[in-house]
A protein has these predicted regions:
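Short, charged surface segments at domain edges that flank catalytic/cofactor-binding sites
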Residues: 2-40, 67-69
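Short, cysteine/histidine-rich loop/knuckle motifs that typically chelate Zn2+
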Residues: 40-45, 81
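Histidine-centered catalytic micro-motifs used for acid/base chemistry in nuclease
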Residues: 41-43, 52-63
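Short, non-ligating residues that shape and space the ligands of small metal-coordination modules
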Residues: 50-54, 88-89
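Short cysteine/histidine-rich metal-coordination sites, predominantly Zn2+-binding motifs
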Residues: 58-64, 94-104
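Short linker/helix segments within small regulatory modules
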Residues: 60-74
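Short Fe-S-cluster ligation motifs
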Residues: 75-80, 107-117
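Short Cys/His-centered divalent metal-binding micro-motifs
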Residues: 75-97
Length: 117
């Protein structure tokens, strides 16, 4: 039996490439915050030893910026609460407006620097 894809389904993210991108975003996060044993949500600065409660979020949308899909600099680490909160607040408006992420993160200078690198 085949199931229909929902109207929001974006197609396969290329499992291996996506997993590699996600891993690289988390490793970059550890280097940027200077903590070798921890990952950090950039909104709340909460340290985590595991990635189970964290998400890698694309700064420039997966849909609209295909050339940046697998660029590890096009990702930030957010806790699940922040990640879901961002998408609840901005829905699809954020797809072509990466600056909405900065707005959501309160325009924090450290966050601006983090995203610019």
């Amino acid at each position: 039996m085949r199931f229909k894809k929902g109207n929001r389904w974006k197609g396969s993210k290329g499992k291996l490439r996506y997993k590699t991108w996600r891993k690289n975003v988390f490793e970059l996060n550890k280097r940027k915050v200077g903590l070798s044993k921890y990952y950090v949500c950039i909104k709340f600065n909460k340290k985590r030893k595991t990635t189970r409660v964290l998400h890698a979020h694309h700064i420039f949308s997966w849909d609209r910026f295909q050339e940046r899909r697998y660029d590890s600099k096009n990702g930030v680490v957010l806790c699940i609460k922040c990640h879901n909160g961002f998408h609840r607040k901005y829905k699809f408006e954020a797809l072509d407006k990466p600056n909405l992420l900065l707005e959501y993160l309160n325009g924090n200078q450290a966050v601006k620097d983090y995203i610019k690198e």
